Amino acid sequence: MTRTLVVTNDFPPRAGGIQSFVHELVARLDDVVVYAPAWEGAATFDDAQNFEVVRHPSSLMLPTRSVSRRAVALLKARGCDAVWFGAAAPLGLLAPALRAAGARRIVATTHGHEAGWAQLPVARQTLRRIGDQVDVVTYLGQYTRGRLERALSASAQGRLERLAPGVDTSFFKPGAGGDVVRHDLGLADRRVIVCVSRLVPRKGQDVLLRALPAVLRSVPDAALLIVGDGPDRKRLEAIADREAVRAAVRFSGPVAWADLPAHYDAGQVFAMPCRTRRRGLDVEGLGIVYLEASATGLPVVAGRSGGAPDAVILGETGHLVDGRDVAAVTGSIVALLRDPAAATAMGAAGRAWVEQDWTWDAAAARLTELLRGTAV
């Protein structure tokens, strides 16, 4: 049986999409040891897992000699014969040392940031080295594959495999407690647009705030719930004040993972009009939040950035918009708020799609095949 060493900078209790991606898959692997950075609350989190987590002394792991020695020692001590890099860059550079130490099979998974790296000459060479040193490089969707192919050698291009995330539809579901959230936030009688994301410019919360005055003119009882935290919060609060919509906006701040389903469920529409920035370096890899919203039964409004369109069936589960176009964002949100029947139908279609095509069990089975070398 394959025993896998997972080497990753991205792991709970640190919050984030990649962290959730890696944890959900690790929790479904048969025999696994995780090597991850230190983080506040890690001891309590690790004790609750059904697999071993070994923490690096610091909160960041880079492909240094120290990290390499620790990873090699762990591989040997635990008898691991496979390695999964939860994010290919930059820790995938450890592959040769782990191969020499006995790793028979090495898989490196890419996300949105590797698609950005593929645009930069030096970073592109790093990706090329990683691709040549591992057995498989995985990608999220067609957009990220296209970006990666331009960075990888012909040999590595032939070893690209899709590994998409899943959604726990028993966790993200309609009726998950949204009424309580709306009541607690003073939104019980409002039609709520919800956005769940880290507060950074690429995610488009600023465009939602600029769209809100026009939304309110068409739907006076609308409100915007911005869930999450991040470095852009003060700027977003200033925009809300400048647009004179602060009374119709709620900033939740950080929300515990266990409380996320209720916050999705507090909305009638999910909107995150993400946009590509920095000449393609800052781009949406996929946008699992759209799938979590769909699982909750919400119609979605997504930005056309990177792989985000892979998480929406246009016209069936939601709308795709230019994330910079305030009028387009306004129009999609208003259309959904003013036609509850259509919005409900889109939400139902989205949940059915996620239940059929986006399960964690299927993703974990795929990863297991890749780690064993049995994928076809």
Where are these regions (language model features)?
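Short His-centered aromatic/hydrophobic patch
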Residues: 85-91
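Conserved donor-binding/catalytic core segment of Leloir-type glycosyltransferases
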Residues: 138, 179, 187-203, 209-212
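Donor nucleotide-sugar binding/catalytic pocket of nucleotide-sugar-dependent glycosyltransferases
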Residues: 108, 124, 129-176, 187, ...
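A short, well-ordered alpha-helix in the C-terminal region of glycosyltransferases
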Residues: 221, 248, 328, 335, ...
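Acidic donor-binding loop of glycosyltransferase active sites
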Residues: 248, 254, 265-283, 298
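Conserved acidic donor-binding segment of nucleotide-sugar-dependent glycosyltransferases
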Residues: 313-327, 335-341
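Nucleotide-activated donor-binding/catalytic signature segment of Leloir-type glycosyltransferases, i.e.
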Residues: 234-261, 269
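Short hydrophobic beta-strand element within catalytic cores of glycosyltransferases
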Residues: 271, 290, 294-295, 299-302, ...
